[in-house]
Amino acid sequence: MFPSVSSPRTPGPGTRRGPLVGIGPTSTPRASRRGLSLGSAVNSPVLFSPAGRRSSVSSRGTPTRIFPHHSISESVNYDVRVFGSSLPVKIMEALTMAEADEQLSVHVDEGGWACLVCTEKLLIWKIAVSPVTKLSVCKELQLPPSDFHGSADLVALSYAATSGEVHSVQAVSVMVATKEGSIRYWPSLAREDTYSDTCVDLGGEKMCRFLTAVQGGSFILSSVGSQLVRLIPESSGKIHQHVLPQGQGMLSGIGRRVSSLFGILSPTSDLMLASVLWDRGGSSFYTLTSSNISKWELDDSSEKQVHSWDVHRTLKESITDAVWGSESNYEAIKEGVNIQYLDLKQNCDGLLILAAAWHLGDSPCLVYYSVITVEDNGNQMSDAVTVEVTQYNPPFQSEDLIACRLMVPNFSSQMTYLYMENAVFVCSTGTGKFSLPQEKIVFDTQGDGILGAGSCAGVPILFSRNSGLVSVTPRENVSLLAEDLEESLTSSVGGRGSESMVFETTTKNETVAHEDKTKLLKAAFLQYCRKDLGRAQIMADELFSSHTDLDSDPELDKAVTQISVDLIDDYPASDPRWAESVPQEAPGLSNTSLIILHQLEDKMKAHCLLVDFLHQVGLFRRLSSYPIRGTPMSTRLLLCEHAEKLSAAITLKNHHSRLPDLVNSAILLALNKRECEVPNSLTPADVFFREVSQVDTICECLLEHEEQVLREVALVSQEWAEVAIDVNTVLKDMLQAATHYRLNKSSMYSQEEVLGKEPEYVPWTATSGPSGIRTAVMRQHGIILKMVYPQADSKLRNVVMEQLVALIDCFLDSYVSQLKSLEKSSDQERYSSLEVEYLQKRSELLSPLLTLGQYPWAASLAEKYCDFDILVQMCEQTDNQARLQRYMTQFADQNFSDFLFRWYLEKGKRGKLLSQPISQHGQLANFLQAHEHLSWLHEINSQELEKAHTTLLGLANMETRYFAKKKTLLGLSKLAALASDISEDRLQEKIEAMAEQERFLLHQETLPEQLLTERQLSLSAMPVLTAPQLISLYICDENRRANEYDFKKALDLLEYIDEEEDVSIDDLKLEILCRALQRDDWSGSDGKDDPIEVSKDSVFVKILQKLIKDGIQLSEYLPEVTDLLRAEQLGSLKSNSYFEFVLKANYEYYVQGQM
């Protein structure tokens, strides 16, 4: 129900950093160690030891008590009570008689029995959750002789009864071992005098360490050196024993996660055994050594080792990164980190490893206890490792004194208990959706101490030397908020216990003021944090019930936004340095952590709980929008923005510890711009980090400081180089933290059904204007490329370029988020204008990378943001055709090929366009369908000759601009047809059709050169002329040398005039003949009486002769002689009687002569 919340620093996949704060008066909290992984910063609120708290235990409320147990230790969040009935008399006597320094140990078995090892005796008694009136069963057994103190780790109970039944005395068998290897076995606890002894020969091995009851009533004895012996009692009393196989069965059926083919350690290895684990459900036995985890599968009499995983390298890296990952000298630190594995347990998430880590170079040197979760996937371990660094960090004293054990009382829960000699520390694995507060509970009264631990019916049980069996369980109403934050939230709504009264009093009025609604919603939120969901639901429903039928409620959006802002900008009023600086109207969400980083992380947890509260009570789905930065913004995304700024602030604070001069300078500039005064009792950092909503104002100030240093400091100085790197780092990490949170937590801020149309989403990382983040990134882009890069050496160039690319990535990602919010919007004009702006900025940012030859970085960004122009330019500049082909495949669904082909066309690179590999021929053909003037080349190259013929013929038919081009296209089409596989009949038909076109073109090709020169025409540049245009040229006056051939061509061209053309063929024929008649002199007969003889050399008569020769029937072809004589085109010839005589004579001679 309560989700985990992320901090903005992620050490790696699956890792988790827990809050690191000292527990107890001798510990020193270190802000730089407070690193949490993304996803865990607020799972565990900051809690100091109970002695340091302001509030009393009673102030947290009184839990319901089922049984009359009495509390034996004060704890804020947990009930520490005597468990079950009073101890048996024998147990109390043994505790009373034991010397103060005598080594006692207890084993609490989950089967409902407990064992106390005391000198030479073993006391076993029955325990139960509920107290009973009769005396508990208690048996006293004699231990086998030994030179060493006995240990409860070498006591094991096996049960004959099936799971779930009450284990009677008769059903319990007991086996004990001494450290030397002596074994004693009681088949039934009911007959304590009946037992059998044997001895295990360890072959010079070190001491025995653990004895574990396993499958089929058998046991496994484990030595310090990790040798394992299976002990199987027989009904005769004999105990059969054999060594477990190590290194067998590993070469078949297992995964390759084994670190080495022969990674199974031999029994003679120097590795030290840390812990063993029996998984009853999976019939699996695990061992944890200083280097590896091994797993065996067992049946009643045999074993098979199925896995051995070298954990040390992986776990050391994960733990080291989780604890010291934020340190500036991390690379140097990690070499000196010491790791010790302490215990191995199991829960629903996998195997749990308890580890301690310390670094002797730390001052002070603390021991960091971590709980690591590793999933067992059957025959191999998962690569994902979750590291929860607990808040238990005692000072390091000696490696020999590191003694801590792990207890997991409930398999289905993530709650864990770390216990040592005089204290227990309650925490969680960090893998659950939420976690209860971490707390250390001390057993340090005189003579007290923890002798052992275990669980019964899922209840965690400790055995205290003074109090006996003790349970440690969470209080029923423990709040999920850090205590101080929860207390101040309570005070903001009127004090503890007044939430309901305030609510009931206020809601009696019909109209509730907005301020009251905000206060009442806080009160409901507080109930939720105390896990009273029912009350929180009632309060939320009553508060906004009048608007349940409406699409949205502006009052709800306003109240939610106000609470969220109040939370992230909370005043740490309990910090004495802030006491005089908190305004009277402060919202009352104060916390008391004196460390800024802790304050930010507590705010993050509270903010996450606020969002989860809104989901749980049904208010989140009713959120609409709220104005921010002058425009409306979806309220759900505004809540996400607040959490993003918390992530960014946590990141900035981590850099503040590493780069105090830079960050402090920027903080001072930011506070001056905002006109914020810094009280004498506070530092500028205190004031700045308090107001998280304004954390983005530091970006502009970082750049101002950087520019000043670059101007004033000498190029050769180290400061000149470092300032650019440091500013880049801070900006980059802040923006990446925000973006990472936005992406990872998107489901947390999503709505199943969005109310109406959401406004455009402008993330705070996408703000423009003088102080906007986009403006800052563009400005830094210019600073790096103009001021730093030209002066830097190769090493510095590589560093700043990598950082700059990360900044550009954040910049472009914000545009993508903004564009996605407009995809479903009806405002396409806004989408289009923003897209144009995005494409322009993308080009401005990436083009310089190409210019500088930073091809890998340019490629990474251009690939991510699909800047195809950059990708093509890069491949052309580097002549990398293989990469181009890869992009065609990679971006096939985004038409990269079309973009590339179009780019080639625009750049005039037609050779490259048409020389694509066969794999791209299909896409090229599709592209060239819209570019037929090139597609025929591709078709010829692809041997598609008939298709090329068709394309060329189509181009020739459409060509009107250039005669020469039309003639060439027609000729190529003819050649393609002749070279194709077209059938003979179809080929002949096509050739004839093309020949007809060629005959027409021949009329233009044979225009007299004199005429072309006169008209200033050239065949190579002439357009394609129509038949009437050609006729006009052939018969025009400029064609002074025109003869019968020219006029015959003009008459022939009449056949090429389409019916669709608005031209009268008869009128045009009449004009041609009139023009021909005008070419001769018809003034006299020159002394000749025969008109036929006189006119035989005229152009007109020669035309008639050619027509007759071509077989044309003149009577049908020529106009009537009367029509010809009346034609206006004859001009003066119309009135020439001699011309009329001769014309009629020739008509009679030639026309009638054909009849």
From Swiss-Prot:
Q: Which UniProt keywords apply?
A: Acetylation, Centromere, Chromosome, Kinetochore, Methylation, mRNA transport, Nuclear pore complex, Nucleus, Phosphoprotein, Protein transport, Translocation, Transport
Superkingdom is: Eukaryota
Chief location of this protein within or outside the cell: nucleus
What does the entry give for GO biological process? mRNA export from nucleus; nephron development; neural tube development; neurogenesis; nuclear pore organization; nucleocytoplasmic transport; paraxial mesoderm development; protein transport
User: Which residues are modified to Phosphoserine?
Assistant: 7, 27, 37, 40, 44, 49, 71, 130, 479, 488, 492, 500, 1132
**Sites bearing N6-acetyllysine, chain numbering:** 786
What is its subcellular localisation? Nucleus, Nuclear pore complex; Chromosome, Centromere, Kinetochore
Spans of biased composition, class Low complexity?
Answer: 8-19
May I have one GO cellular component term? nuclear pore outer ring
Cite the record's note on assembly.
Answer: Forms part of the Nup160 subcomplex in the nuclear pore which is composed of NUP160, NUP133, NUP107 and Nup96. This complex plays a role in RNA export and in tethering Nup98 and NUP153 to the nucleus.
Q: What is this protein called?
A: Nuclear pore complex protein Nup133
Q: Which organism is it from?
A: Mus musculus (Mouse)
